[in-house]
């Protein structure tokens, strides 16, 4: 009699887990379609981010229109431009203040590898040296279309969590 009770409790738990797995897909869909990026820029690539926010590219059709001025309300950081050693702790502090789950896009040659300034004494050789970068968008500066493609790749990674490796 005790064995049957344990089996029935296990069946109830299995049923709940299957339901939660289905909810995970819904949550990942919602996260991928409602990213809230942090508004801050480091250099010339930030100008391209501003250009991408205009009506010509219409990022709002993908749900990417809510730019947050506070890191506590944002879940996406776009590191766009040269990161100096003096700016590195501030960027890291902004990242630490962001809400979970949080994602990082490195946009431009300077954010990815230091760009043409990599041999300078004050330039950090890439955002991935101190931040977990999810998507890299190469270029100097990348076009707004490249930013849109990178955002869609991040959306794909969020909606398929097996792709995300940290």
Swiss-Prot record:
Cofactor(s) this protein cannot do without: [4Fe-4S] cluster
Cofactor mode of binding and number, as noted: Binds 1 [4Fe-4S] cluster.
Keyword Manganese: no
Pfam (any one): Oxidored_q6
One annotated Gene Ontology cellular component of this protein: respiratory chain complex I
Catalytic activity reported: a quinone + NADH + 5 H(+)(in) = a quinol + NAD(+) + 4 H(+)(out)
Name of the protein in its database record: NADH-quinone oxidoreductase subunit B
């Amino acid at each position: 009699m005790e064995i049957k009770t344990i089996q029935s409790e296990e069946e109830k738990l299995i049923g709940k887990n299957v339901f939660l797995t289905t909810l995970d897909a819904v949550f990942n869909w919602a996260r991928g379609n409602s990213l809230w990026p942090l508004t801050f820029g480091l250099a010339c690539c930030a100008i391209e981010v501003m250009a991408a926010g205009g009506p010509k590219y219409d990022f709002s059709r993908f749900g990417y229109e809510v730019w947050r001025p506070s890191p506590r309300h944002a879940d996406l950081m776009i590191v766009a431009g040269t990161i100096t050693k003096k700016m590195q702790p501030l960027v890291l502090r902004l990242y630490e203040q962001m809400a979970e789950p949080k994602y990082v896009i490195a946009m431009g040659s300077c954010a990815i590898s230091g760009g043409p300034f990599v041999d300078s004494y004050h330039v950090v050789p890439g955002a991935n040296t101190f931040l977990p970068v999810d998507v890299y968008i190469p270029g100097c500066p990348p076009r707004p279309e490249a930013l849109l493609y990178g955002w869609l790749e991040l959306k794909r990674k969020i909606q398929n969590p097996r792709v995300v490796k940290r």
